[in-house]
Amino acid sequence: MYSMATGTVKWFNNAKGFGFICPEGEDGDIFAHYSTIQMDGYRTLKAGQQVSYQVEQGPKGYHASCVVPIEGQSAK
């Protein structure tokens, strides 16, 4: 079982279906594909959004799997 990491969405391109996450307390960016986003309806992320995810090693570097948006970060 992988542990979940947290980070902030750097950018996400809806037309291309991918973007990058800045991991919390780590250097480098993590690739995120729309197919790994765990949510109902249209799967998308927004820049600045907090997410939790699992990190996997892929052929082109690290990528996020099982991306879950963190709700209610600053509900004030």
Swiss-Prot record:
Predominant location category: cytoplasm
InterPro entries: Cold_shock_CspA, CSD, CSD_CS, CSP_DNA-bd, CspD, NA-bd_OB-fold
Domain CSD: start-end pairs: 7-67
Keywords (A to Z) from UniProt: Activator, Cytoplasm, DNA-binding, Transcription, Transcription regulation
Gene3D superfamilies: Nucleic acid-binding proteins (2.40.50.140)
Entry superkingdom: Bacteria
Subcellular localization, as worded in the UniProt entry: Cytoplasm
Molecular function in Gene Ontology: DNA binding; nucleic acid binding
Gene Ontology cellular component terms for the protein in this record: cytosol
Biological processes annotated in GO: regulation of DNA-templated transcription; regulation of gene expression
Record-given protein name: Cold shock-like protein CspD
Source organism (scientific name): Vibrio cholerae serotype O1 (strain ATCC 39315 / El Tor Inaba N16961)
Source species taxonomy: Bacteria, Pseudomonadati, Pseudomonadota, Gammaproteobacteria, Vibrionales
